[in-house]
Amino acid sequence: MKQEIIDRFTRYAKVDTQSTEASNTVPTTEGQLELGRILVEELKALGLTEVTMDDNGYVMATLESNTNKEVPTIGFLAHLDTATEFTGKNVNPQVHEYNGGDIELGHGYVLSPKQFPELAGYEGHTLITTDGTTLLGADDKAGIAEIMTAMDYLIKHPEIEHGKIRVAFTPDEEIGRGPAHFDVDAFGAAFAYTLDGGPLGQFQYESFNAAAAKVSFYGVSTHPGTAKNKMVNAIKRAIEFHSQLPANEAPEFTEGYEGFYHLLSMEGNADFAELHYIIRDFDRQQFANRKAKMEAIAWEMQEKHGKGKVSIELRDQYYNMREKIEPQKEIVEVALEAMEKLGIDPKVGPIRGGTDGSQLSYKGLPTPNIFTGGENYHGRYEYVSVDNMEKAVHVIVNIANLVAQRAK
């Protein structure tokens, strides 16, 4: 199975599927459609039915039930796109039999346990890394490879009882648009799981409440030599705004259940400047308070500098899926039992981020998140353990079987 996983993953990783905020098309990039078409053909070749890809790039397929029991339909999902933070073009995956120490990625870059201490725990594993020039795309092509391999395994092992299984691969998850055009009714599952987590055993059914903010500043540009009492520097107004947010409530200073404000980008000149933020908090009231604080700062600056000099736009992105999953704890219990049967110690904790499941849970499809085996996502030091990918495959298989066993 390991070689199948390696072959699938490296094949998918080589397709450039980075999404982009700059596009309003669905999906936002052609590469996602390219990978979707590849998966459609592979799903058909495996023997799945009802294989579709719609105009928006959503791929869906069915593995039919092999039992006469009335088993609820379950789903497994992963996303097609890779992150925007680092290039995903010309990905060249490297396979290593890791025996400890540093890994030479190439181009002068080294993956070292001195910088990434968790690497030492992977001694004896088969690892896939980058060549140092791109991200790897294990987020979330590891999840795609695991779902595909699990479906193949179930087809080849008809003695493993399971109900109807739906799989889906979604575009634009990394920019928060994954579920925007996802047809929950057409998918037809009672509940689902995303394969979009990190290290072995990770299981998550709590996510941030999330919003985006755009703050605009309007200045007056004049020649700096004759600017006295005339120039209004919009960049300085932007700095003034940012300085009023709590400095210690940023990603680099927070962990666990702590929320934050994150300045994603700053652009502009003396005439006009713009700040782009994301706002995150697990608690719904604290989330509301954070948004209110940003609005209050903008309002105070309006009062100080004049109307029309500062504007703010806030947009909610997704909410904490715990509110939708906790009432159906059997979804969690089945996944944890599936891991424990493999000797995996489940590591249940919050996602300091979001998945497609965050939004899908609010669209009527409760969807917690399962590990894929990857580390250091979104950069050149990203890697994934093939050994732990294989365990993720068996978690999928066990979930399908346990749901069938629990049915009458």
Swiss-Prot record:
Known EC number: 3.4.11.4
Protein residues bound to Zn(2+) 2: 139, 174, 378
Catalyzed chemical reaction(s): Release of the N-terminal residue from a tripeptide
Enzyme class: hydrolase
Record Gene3D superfamilies: 3.30.70.360, Zn peptidases
Binding of Zn(2+) 1, residues: 79, 139, 196
Cell compartments where the protein resides: Cytoplasm
Keywords (A to Z) from UniProt: Aminopeptidase, Cytoplasm, Hydrolase, Metal-binding, Metalloprotease, Protease, Zinc
Coiled-coil intervals: none
Short name of any one Pfam family annotated for the protein: M20_dimer
Record bears the keyword Ion transport: no
CDD domains: M20_peptT (cd03892)
One GO CC term, this protein: cytosol
Gene Ontology molecular-function annotations: metallopeptidase activity; tripeptide aminopeptidase activity; zinc ion binding
Listed SUPFAM superfamilies: Bacterial exopeptidase dimerisation domain (SSF55031), Zn-dependent exopeptidases (SSF53187)
Location of the active site: 81, 173 (proton acceptor)
Cofactor note as given: Binds 2 Zn(2+) ions per subunit.
Named cofactor requirement(s): Zn(2+)
Domain of life: Bacteria
GO biological process: peptide catabolic process; proteolysis
Record PANTHER family: PEPTIDASE T
Function, in words: Cleaves the N-terminal amino acid of tripeptides.
Family, per entry: Belongs to the peptidase M20B family.
Protein name: Peptidase T
Gene, per the UniProt record: pepT
